[in-house]
Amino acid sequence: MTEKRYLKWYNKVGYGSGDIAGNVVYAFLSSFVMIYLTNTVGLNPGIVGTLIAVSKLLDGVTDIFFGSLIDKTHSKMGKARPWMLYGYIGCAITLVAIFAIPTNLGQFAQYAWFLIAYTLLNAVFYTANNIAYSALTALVTKNSAEQVEMGSWRFMFAFATSLLIQSITLGAVTALGGGAAGWRTVAIIYAIIGLLVNTLSVFSVKELPEGELVDTTDKKEIEQDEKYNLVQAAKLLAGNKFYMMICVTYILQQIYGAMISMGTYYATYILGNQNLFGVFSWAINIPLIIALVFTPTLVAKWNGMYKLNVMSYTLATISRALVAVAGYMGSGNVTLMLLFTAIAALGQGPWQGDMNAAIAACSEYTWLTKHKRVDGTMYSCTSLGVKLGGGLGTAITGWLLAASHFDSALTVQPASCISMLKIMYLVIPFALDAIITFILSRMKVEEANEKLRAAV
């Protein structure tokens, strides 16, 4: 029997555009915050890394907290849309604050300014916005194919935005005056764009009635299912092995992204051309977008996500190994590096596209095994993964730069720094892809749900 469809094409496109807003925050922050803080503000990368790690201590708690709040929210706009709408206002303000650190402050005050703004952005505002945005996948449709399509549209916009930001930001900073003023102006422009697009995305979809989401008209049953505290919510998540797999995978992907963002340093100090970072961004994001276009069709053709995800990520792992080989050829064979980078990105695309549908399947697994509807809490893995993985990745890059004696005042870095940059940009991404492939080979949530339904 054909599944009921809930969405028009413009609903899916409107929803997907929300990740333009998400990435004018995340892509901008993850790609450029370290080089801004070290080369413009003059802060120590090791101390910055430590502050980011300290900030991450709050993130796990706030993810579950906001996920639980979303599950228990009842409003005319639904459960998730109010949090997505209002959370972004704080995102815009704190993003500008991070890239507007006064240069005339003492260094202690500058570190404190960064820590406060970064923590508020990640632990509070981005958490509320991103969990709500991700949870909409399960709240506006029950059709699994539409959930995959929503994920594909979302990440097509995400990677296109990331590509644009990585390609134009450094040039835009220079064009707008350079230095601290240039960074501040660019941040303001991105924040305004994000506010406008996020608002459009919120009002492009409508959440389904709660009774339809849980296949019951019994209001008391719905209310009973929502009666759990934060500790119980954490236990529900920890008890879902597929949630834990996705959460770890998400964290590893964000650490991967932080290592790839070291391309700004790699291009500048090893390849000798800062502009090559933008070229590598094209080699990553265009294949990802192409893969996302075909992901819904491939999922339908292969009757599920499992085989597609495992096979495509195996291709990505092999390709990243070849990127490393090409990178260690003398000063680096740029042509081969670009080729294998593109193939690796093509392999990573399907999982990006169907990840939200996999999380929805995880939520269904909890419903089938525990009879608890925890869609908002379940989608905490997206926010937790982005913040914890991205933050930890950025912290690690700061620590490794400091340990390798990076000096922003030098045009030629010491050999220890050059070696470390190669490890961060070439070796670690390959290792992370290999681990993700192994985890995906165990991600049989669709099969588990089918068995549970058959047993009812």
Regions found by a protein language model. Give the residues of each.
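Membrane-embedded alpha-helical bundles of multi-pass transporters/translocases
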Residues: 2-456
